[in-house]
A protein has these predicted regions:
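Short intrinsically disordered terminal tails
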Residues: 1, 90-95
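Acidic, low-complexity, intrinsically disordered interaction modules
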Residues: 20-89
Length: 95
């Protein structure tokens, strides 16, 4: 799945977050600007210093990190790219 295909599929969801290790952090803003210029709105970027994209442990680390940062959100989907990760977040409804 390409980055653009992923965005096209998941942009309809409530919340899309970029999560990336700090060594890629500056580059992510350029990528987000390109996507936002194409009318695909990215809401925020979170700098992640704990996830080294180790395949067997990545989902656990990211879920743990986001649980701490976004207590009222549930991690729904991951897309691991070249040095970055997109996370689809669906906020819990207040019922």
């Amino acid at each position: 799945m390409t980055l653009n295909n992923f965005i096209n599929i998941w942009i309809r969801k409530k919340h899309i977050v970029y999560l990336c290790p700090d060594k890629y952090y500056e580059d992510m803003f350029d990528l987000i600007d390109e996507i936002n210029d194409g009318k695909k709105k990215i809401e925020e970027i979170i700098e992640c210093t704990i996830c080294a994209f180790i395949p067997d442990s990545c989902d656990f680390l990211v879920a743990y990190y986001l649980k701490d940062k976004l207590a009222d959100a549930e991690v729904k989907h991951f897309y691991i790219g070249d040095g970055y990760m997109i996370v689809w977040i669906e906020e819990e409804s207040e019922q």
